[in-house]
Amino acid sequence: MSNVRSDKPFVLAGRTYQSRLLVGTGKYRDMEETRLAIEASGAEIVTVAVRRTNIGQNPGEPNLLDILPPDRYTILPNTAGCYDAVEAVRTCRLARELLDGHNLVKLEVLADQKTLFPNVLETLKAAEVLVKEGFDVMVYTSDDPIIARQLAEMGCIAVMPLAGLIGTGLGICNPYNLQIILEEAKVPVLVDAGVGTASDATIAMELGCEAVLMNSAIAHAQQPVMMAEAMKHAIVAGRLAYLAGRMPKKLYASASSPLDGLIK
């Protein structure tokens, strides 16, 4: 069958990953809960807000890398808390220095504190500089397919459209824009922000996303470690459903059992 989908590896910056779940490190009660939840998630890529989390820039304070060692996890420094391109570029340079030349970064440039929507103009400016400086840029963006295309053409290695506002747990608010982005994508597309529970993650994967990044959905759950495990299974289920191909939707019923040979 020509429409049968075959799985392909999840590759970022030349490295292949088994888990398609990426997780954040903020909002947990303490370091131990952070460690346990991330272990339960099965994630291999962990994103860290460089401006809010100590990864070596504050000697003498607890260092997140003590519980999430870079030899076990791929650390994905992000620019959360940056509101212009200059701040974002400076933060990425600091992260590269702290992580011994590490080039993989998650770029996010926010528009305001109320919505945490991406400022796409500043994001485009920052992305252009970072790509020229040799960074492997994964970029948080709006669900505008044109902006996503421009970021990919600029050289970003992955685009990460929001599913809903950061921290809201509203789920996949605009699956139609996301579908357009996926259809046009020349780089991996990861849903970033808005996921609230396991079914949201599954829907994102069923649509064809390469992976999902989340933080609040796990950290704000009543039992974060249990939710982390639920998310691990949700990602796998969604990917398998995408590869399997769902049945077509119909307006009218269709009997599961054949009508031929009915007992009279």
UniProtKB/Swiss-Prot annotation:
E.C. no: 2.8.1.10
Single GO biological process annotation from the record: thiamine diphosphate biosynthetic process
The name this protein goes by in its record: Thiazole synthase
InterPro entries, per database record: Aldolase_TIM (IPR013785), Thiazole_synthase_ThiG (IPR033983), ThiG (IPR008867)
Gene3D superfamilies for the chain: Aldolase class I
Keywords: Cytoplasm, Schiff base, Thiamine biosynthesis, Transferase
Protein source organism: Pseudomonas fluorescens (strain ATCC BAA-477 / NRRL B-23932 / Pf-5)
Keyword Transferase: yes
Active-site residues annotated for this sequence: 106 (schiff-base intermediate with dxp)
